[in-house]
Amino acid sequence: LEEFVKTLQNFINGKNVPSSSDKTQDLINPATGQVFAKAPVSNAKDIDDAMKSAEKAFETWRDSTPGERQKAINKIADAIEARSEELIKIESENTGKPIAVTRQEEIGPMLDQIRFFAGAARHLEGRSAAEYFKGHTSFIRREPIGVCAQVTPWNYPMMMAVWKWAPAIAAGNTVVLKPSDTTPVSTLWMAELMQEFLPEGVINVVTGDRETGRLLVDHEIPQFVSITGSVRAGMEVAKEASKDLKKVHLELGGKAPVVIFDDANLEAACEWIAVAGYFNAGQDCTAATRVIVEASAYEDVVTLLSEQAKNNIKVGMPEEDVLVGPVNNANQLSRVQGFLDRVPGHARVTAGGSKVERPGYFWSPTVVADLRQDDEMIQNEMFAPVITIQKFADEAEAVRMANGVKYGLASSVWTKDHGRAMRMAKAFDFGCVWINTHIPMVAEMPHGGFKHSGYGKDLSGYGFEEYTRIKHVMTNLNA
């Protein structure tokens, strides 16, 4: 393990290979602030080598049977599960995540997602077959697209890698994946493990920065690009991909509204919302961090969430029994500090609001109340352990406030009134609506948003179909 993390290389054509670039980037453990490895900043030649490797592998991988792909992917899941403690340690060192939380909340769902897509490989179907033109039968083929260029973020490195490569290779595609420049280690580890079960070139991983990502998108070989990242990054990818008319899937930022009516079980709701807001240090595009409360319950919710932040949400080192670790990097910590430095005069910080005085990039669980709709903390994704609270008067205002942001990924409503809950679910302009819960996900259901949260879906059969193309075949019955 120590040897692996200190000598990072790209993974191309089934092998760990040194970059042709002499430029590297330090990898820092966010829990300590200390450098623990270096990763190459890959250049155009590295990208070209990876793309050509994937292109060659596609010639044969596309002809593998769904059953063969299912078998290979299930073996990958079994191998990851057998070595999961090693992976947890690697992920924690690179991200600062609490080890116990990573073991309990990430490994299990990630393995389930891999196995879901293994099974999905055998369930592609064309939804139409008939004689629409006399004497001729038409049917639909769903085919792999080819080489897929993929970019993953730093908030869930290993899980987001799975969301990309699992549906891609299950559908018969090959992959060139660039993980975030700050968190490449678990993805490289995974690719090396996967190679035992895949032909050379099916999975390729290159590390690097924003320019490396641009080279990935600009390359002539891939005709599909999938990114999970910031709105800025997604817009840049869409712009570059449009020059070659590449198909694009974007899973971008979020600013999830959490609408609480006064008939909700406030204590239970606030206990759950605190976990859903502070989990992963709030670095989740679906995090329950924008709370909107009916006026008659407002002060009770402010008090309950502030008490949760102060007393029940523990922050600490990966080895400790805590929910919250550090934010991912120094720039992110500085960004959070900036938001809190600019809290408007009409708002009040009722919990936290400052860095934790220890090495690393830790921020205290924070609650900011009395914010207005046009405040920057409401309109912009903070990606931090900061919950904001606003007040609404009636259903119509709650909907306006919930929808009044540029994002459209996830949302929740808390009420005992089923009719009201369903009205809100219909009115919310978000790709996911939870009712009396927030943040659970399952492999069978799609994840993806509207507006500046991007387009396309991860997970589910819909996410699997993103990695296919549709072909109409017509045959003359009398020939």
Residue spans for each PLM region:
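Rossmann-like NAD(P) dinucleotide-binding subdomain of oxidoreductase/dehydrogenase enzymes
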Residues: 126-268, 392
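ALDH superfamily catalytic-core signature
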Residues: 232-372, 435
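Residue-level signal for inorganic ion chemistry
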Residues: 33, 69, 91, 114, ...
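Short, well-ordered beta-strand elements within core beta-sheets of diverse protein domains
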Residues: 36-42, 57-63, 150, 258-261, ...
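Hydrophobic face of amphipathic alpha-helices that form TPR/SEL1-like repeat modules
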Residues: 1-31
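Conserved C-terminal structural/oligomerization subdomain of aldehyde/semialdehyde dehydrogenase
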Residues: 32-38, 222, 259, 355, ...
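Structural signal for hydrophobic packing residues in well-ordered secondary-structure cores
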Residues: 58, 62, 77-84, 88, ...
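Glycine-rich loop-to-alpha-helix module at the N-terminal edge of alpha/beta enzyme cores
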Residues: 34-124
